[in-house]
Curated annotation (Swiss-Prot):
The gene is yfaS. The lineage of its organism: Bacteria, Pseudomonadati, Pseudomonadota, Gammaproteobacteria, Enterobacterales. GO terms for molecular function: endopeptidase inhibitor activity. Belongs to the protease inhibitor I39 (alpha-2-macroglobulin) family. Bacterial alpha-2-macroglobulin subfamily. The keyword Signal applies. It comes from the Bacteria. Keywords: Signal. It comes from Escherichia coli O157:H7. The keyword Secreted does not apply. SMART domains: A2M (SM01360), A2M_N_2 (SM01359). This is Alpha-2-macroglobulin homolog. Residues 1-38 form the signal peptide.
Amino acid sequence: MDTQRFQSQFHWHLSFKFSGAIAACLSLSLVGTGLANADDSLPSSNYAPPAGGTFFLLADSSFSSSEESKVRLEAPGRDYRRYQMEEYGGVDVRLYRIPDPMAFLRQQKNLHRIVVQPQYLGDGLNNTLTWLWDNWYGKSRRVMQRTFSSQSRQNVTQALPELQLGNAIIKPSRYVQNNQFSPLKKYPLVEQFRYPLWQAKPVEPQQGVKLEGASSNFISPQPGNIYIPLGQQEPGLYLVEAMVGGYRATTVVFVSDTVALSKVSGKELLVWTAGKKQGEAKPGSEILWTDGLGVMTRGVTDDSGTLQLQHISPERSYILGKDAEGGVFVSENFFYESEIYNTRLYIFTDRPLYRAGDRVDVKVMGREFHDPLHSSPIVSAPAKLSVLDANGSLLQTVDVTLDARNGGQGSFRLPENAVAGGYELRLAYRNQVYSSSFRVANYIKPHFEIGLALDKKEFKTGEAVSGKLQLLYPDGEPVKNARVQLSLRAQQLSMVGNDLRYAGRFPVSLEGSETVSDASGHVALNLPAADKPSRYLLTVSASDGAAYRVTTTKEILIERGLAHYSLSTAAQYSNSGESVVFRYAALESSKQVPVTYEWLRLEDRTSHSGDLPSGGKSFTVNFDKPGNYNLTLRDKDGLILAGLSHAVSGKGSMSHTGTVDIVADKTLYQPGETAKMLITFPEPIDEALLTLERDRVEQQSLLSHPANWLTLQRLNDTQYEARVPVSNSFAPNITFSVLYTRNGQYSFQNAGIKVAVPQLDIRVKTDKTHYQPGELVNVELTSSLKGKPVSAQLTVGVVDEMIYALQPEIAPNIGKFFYPLGRNNVRTSSSLSFISYDQALSSEPVAPGATNRSERRVKMLERPRREEVDTAAWMPSLTTDKQGKAYFTFLMPDSLTRWRITARGMNGDGLVGQGRAYLRSEKNLYMKWSMPTVYRVGDKPSAGLFIFSQQDNEPVALVTKFAGAEMRQTLTLHKGANYISLAQNIQQSGLLSAELQQNGQVQDSISTKLSFVDNSWPVEQQKNVMLGGGDNALMLPEQASNIRLQSSETPQEIFRNNLDALVDEPWGGVINTGSRLIPLSLAWRSLADHQSAAANDIRQMIQDNRLRLMQLAGPGARFTWWGEDGNGDAFLTAWAWYADWQASQALGVTQQPEYWQHMLDSYAEQADNMPLLHRALVLAWAQEMNLPCKTLLKGLDEAIARRGTKTEDFSEEDTRDINDSLILDTPESPLADAVANVLTMTLLKKAQLKSTVMPQVQQYAWDKAVNSNQPLAHTVVLLNSGGDATQAAAILSGLTAEQSTIERALAMNWLAKYMATMPSVVLPAPAGAWAKHKLTGGGEYWRWVGQGVPDILSFGDELSPQNVQVRWREAAKTAQQSNIPVTVERQLYRLIPGEEEMSFTLQPVTSNEIDSDALYLDEITLTSEQDAVLRYGQVEVPLPPGADVERTTWGISVNKPNAGKQQGQLLEKARNEMGELAYMVPVKELTGTVTFRHLLRFSQKGQFVLPPARYVRSYAPAQQSVAAGSEWTGMQVK
C-alpha cells in the first residue's frame, strides 16, 4: 500500500520553524488517541537535510537570440565532496529576466560576480509529514493486529490475500529533496527545473586538443563539469540561480544580436557596435562607460555603429550597452600607459658581465623628449649613482655630473668578495630615479686547463668540425681518465633586414656527449657539420674526481667573416601572374658571388630555381599561384648569400581561420610616400573597422565606406588593398589595424607603418683585422648623417667577444632606446569575451580553509671561467670633428681572442647611432707561466711554462735568464699546449725572463719576479728610534724582511702609522673586519679630495669589508665570531653594527634610525649574561650612534653597584702581557670590571645621569685602570678626564701589531679627536735601495728593496733629529713566544677513487713524496691538555708553493683504510681562509680533541721546506703551540 501518494502538498509554503511546531503537535495528538496497547515509541527516521556542496557557476560567453543559451557548472567530481552532493539528485535551476538591465548592472560592484541576496527557507515540512504519516500508519496497523487473534488474522488473509500487511509498515520512508531557497520575487521567473548533475554529459575538450607529455591527463572529461541548456531567449539580460542543498550560486546571461568592439586609449574610448552574425554596423545602441563605481560618460552609436567618448581612462573600465532590440552586452577594458614622453637617460656599462674585483665603467647619455621625435638637451645637474648587489644591498654611491651635451660618466670597482648575480645601477637625477643593470659571475681558478686545438684554421659549411681537447695540470702533466661532458649550441648567421646577425642558440645533438680523456689527456672532438654559416659555442665540463667540475666555453666560427648580399624588390607583395624584379648587391667586396636563385612556396613547399646572369644585378620571377614565398641567393657551393620573403595575392588567397593577414609593400617609408597594405581575410568579408592608432585612435573608417584618409580596392572575395598616404606625423611608426566580427567571433590584426627617422651612421675601422698581443691598435671612427659628415659625441668600448657568449648585451641599441618604435597605446576588446561567474557557498557560515603554498627553488648555473682582461679599451667621451672623424689607439691585451668594438654616439640635435666592428688577437707562438712566484728559503722548485703553438712540428729556441745565467733550449712543438720544464736552478729571489725565438726572430717574451721568503712563521715587529744626520745604526735581526721606515715625529704621524698597520691586518672574521672598517673610515674622513686615486682605493677597501660583514651576518642580523652556525653573540653583533655605522657615516650612506635598532635588540636579550666590560662597550657605541640607551645605562650602573669590590680585586696583581686582549681574553677580570666602571662613569656624565656606585668603588676602579699597562684602560681614562694630543700619542705609541685589532681600532677611533689636521712630516730619502710608498691614511714611508739587511741608515747632515718607527718581519723562532698546552698533529691522506663517483678511500701518506696529479685530504687534530676552554684561536697550516685548498667538499665521501664496504663519511664543509703559502682555520672554542679536514691539491713540482703547523691564540698571539717533530716540514712534489 503506497502511503505517500496521499500526502498533502501544502508543506511547500511552510517555513522550517512552522513545520517543526506542527510535528510536535501531531506527536502529542497521537499519544492521546487511546493507543495504549500499541508500542508508543517512535523509531528514528535516520533523516538529515541534504548538505550539498560548493560548485562554480559561470557564463563564459554571450548569446544571440537564435542561439541556445547555456551556463557552465563545475562541481567536484573526483573526491569526497561529490558524495555530499549526489543524494540531492541534481541541481535546481531558475531563470529570471531582468526588467531594467542597465540599472541592474550599474548597481553591481563587480560585474563578473553578480550579487543577488537569496531567500533561504531550509528543508521545509514535507519530509517531516512523510515520516509522521508512515509512522502513524504502522502503529495503527499494529493496534488493529492486536484486536484480532493470530488465528483470525491468518484465516482472513488466506481468504483475502490482498489484506496481507507484508513489509509495508517496516519499509523506510521515501523522502523528497526540496529546494531550500524561495524564488526571487523581484524578477520575473522565466522557468525553473531540476537538471541531472552527475548523469549529464561532461564538457569535453575540442577535437584534437591534447597536451603531449601531460601525466595527469587534466583535460579529460570530468563528471560534474557540465553545460546546462537554457533554451533560446529573447534579447535581454537574464539571471540564473543554481542550487544544490544549502548551496547557491548566481550568474547572468547576456542575450544580444549585437557585439560591442571597443578601443580604449589614455583619454578616449571608441566603440563599434556590429551584428553578431554577419558583422554589419548596427547603429542606435545606448552605451555607458563606467569604472565600476559610477558612469563616467555615455552616448549612442551613430549610423556607422561607432561612438567616441572622451574621458581619462582608468586601468579597468566597463562598457554597458543596450541595442535597439533590447539586447544587453558588457565589455571589459584594460588600459595601461605604455609610452610616456619625458627625460630618457641611457645608462650602460663597458660590458655586461664582470668578475668580483673588476672595475666597472659607466656612461650616461640623455635627452628630454616632448613627443616621439622631438627632444631637447637635458638640464646639466649633479646626480648620484647607486650600486645594488644581487641581494639588494647598497654597495656604494658614486657622484656623477650630467652635462647637457656630453652626458656623464663614472667608474667604481666591485668588491673582491662580490656575490654573483644581477646588479642594479640606480641614477638619482632631478628627483627621478633611472635604472640599468649588469651581471657578476664568480670564478674559481681551475686546477687544470682545457685547451682546444682544431684540425683546420677555417671550416666551411658542410664540413665536419674536428680537433681535440687537451687537459693539462699546471705542471704539464696530462689529466688522465677525466670524465668530460660536451654541450654544443649553434647560432646561425641569418639575414635580417640585410644585416648579418647571430640567431638564437639552439642545442646540437652530439653522438658522444660524454667521454673520457686518454693517457695523454686528449679527447677527440668530432662535431657535426653546419649547413649554414654559424657560430658554435662548445661548453666543456670536465671532472677528475674533484668536488667541482672545470667548465669552459669555446667559440668556433663557421665561415667567419663571410661577405653577404642585399636582396630587395619594389614591393613586398605582388599579384599572381605579375612579373617581379628582384635586385641584389654586395655589401662588401668578396670573392663569393651568387650564381643561382631559388624560391619556396610555404603553403605546399613547392620550389623552383634558376641561374643568375654573370655580373648581373637583378632577376625576374613570375609567380603563378598566390601565397607566401621565400627567395634565396646561393653561390657555386650552394651557400646562402641573401634571403627575402615575398607575398603574392590572387583569387583563392585567404588567411588562417580567425586571423587577418596584413602585408605592407615596404618595411620603411619616407614622408610623402603611400603605404600599400594587402589585407587578407579568412573568409569573404564585407564590413570591418579600419583604424590608425598610436597614442589614440588617430583615424577610423569602415571597410564598406572608406574615409578620406585612405583608399580601398577590393581585389577578390577575401583580399583588399588599402593605400594610406604617409605624413610626417606618422614617424617613427603608426599602427594600421583591421577589426571585424562574424558568427560570434571577432578578430583583429595590427601592422606597423614604419617611417624613417634620421640616424647617425657610425663606422668603426681598424688598420688591420688581426693583431698580436702588445701591438698598437689604431681605430678610426666616422660619424655621418644622410651621407654627410657630422660632429658627434661618441663612447667606444673594446670587449672580449666571449663575454657576449656568456652574457648577451644587456643595454639596448641606442637608437631603439631613444627613438623606439612607439608602442600602440590603444587596447582592443569585445563584449564576446566577458565572463561572469560565482562560487556556491553554504548558507551556514563556515571556517575558512588554510592556505597552501609551495616554495619555488632557484637553480644556479655552473660557474664559467674567463681570461684576465675583458675590456681592452674604454673611451667614454670622444668627439668627432667637422669631417666626422675621430681616432684613438690602445695596446692589444696579452690574450688570444676575438674582440668586439662597439661605438655609440649622439650629435647636438639628439640624433643617435651605433656601430660595431670586430678584430682578433692571434699569435702563432704564445707563452704562459705555469709556476708560483713566492717560495720559501730552501725550496727547489721545478720551474716550467706553457707554450701554445698554432704550428705543428716547427723547431723553436727557448732562451731563459735568471740571476745572471742564460740557458737555451731547442724545442720541437706540437700543435696546442706544450709544457716545457726549465733548466735553471732557482733558489733565490730574482727576475726570471723567457724569450721564444724562431728563425732568429723573437716571437714572444715574458718575465716574472720570483721571491723567496723565510721558511719560518713570520712575526711583525716594530721599534721607535731617533735618527739624525749622517749614519745611524739600525741593529735589526739578520733574518729581518719587509723593512720599512716611517716618521713618528708628531702625534699625527703616530696616528697614521697605527692606522696603516691596522688596515694591513689579515683574515676576515667579525672582529678583524670591523677593526679594518673603523680605521678606513677615519682615513676617508681625513682626505681632502674624495675623488682622488687614494680616495678610490680607500672607498674600495671600505666596500670590500662592508660586504664581508654582510656575508658574515646570521639569522636576524646577528653575528657570530666567524659566521659559524649558532646563536648570535650580542657583543660581536654590536661591534659589527658599530663598524658598519662608522663606514656608512663616512661614505654618506643613509639608513633609517630603526635600521640600527638590531644592535640594541640583541643586547637586551643577552645583557644579563654579558661581562660588564662588554656591556659598557656596547652602550658606548650605542650612545655614539645616538641610539636610545639611558635606561640601559641605568641598568649597567646598577649591575656595577651590585658587584662592588671583592677581596681578590686587591690581592690580584696585574701581571698580564701588554699584548694580551682585555676585551676578548679576560673580559671578566677585575681590571676589565674596573675599566667598565670608568667607561660607565663617562657615559653617565654624557647622558646627564647620576651613578649609584659607591665613591670608593669608583676610586678603586680609577686607580686600577690608571696603573694598568693596557692601552684600552689608558684610553678609557683619557676619555673620562680629558687630555691632549701628546697624551693620546703616548697611548698610540704603545700599540703594536701583536695586540688585539679591536682594542687598537677602539683606541684610534676614540683618540682621533685629539689629532689636529697637520701636514705630513717628510722623512728624507735614506741612502741606499729604499723605495717610497704611500700610507693608507696619508703620509709616506720608505721600504728596503735591496739585498740583505741594512746595518746603517745614512741621511744628509742637514737632517735634524727625528723620531722614526722601524717595522720589520722576522721568523717566529727568533721572536719571544710562550707555548700553551695544546698538541697539534697533522696527517695527509691520498684519495683513492672508489667504485662510485665522488667516493674515495683514504690512503695514509707515510713519506714526504706527493703526487701532483692526486687529490689529498689534510687532517689537523688539536688536543687541549687543560680543562679550561681556550677561546678565539686559529690553526695555521703551511702549504708548499702552488698548493691550494679545494673550495668545496660537496658530495665527496671518504672511507678510512680497512673500512671494508662501510658507507663512506661525507666531508664537512670547508672552513678556511687562504694566506700566503698557508691556510688558516678559525677555532672559536677548543676543549678536548677537535679535527679539521680539507682537500688539497699540489700543482708545483719540486722540493719544498715547510714550517710546522701551529695553533695560535688569536688575541694573545704570543701564546701558541706548534706541531712536534719534523714530520711535514718538507715535501717533494712529483
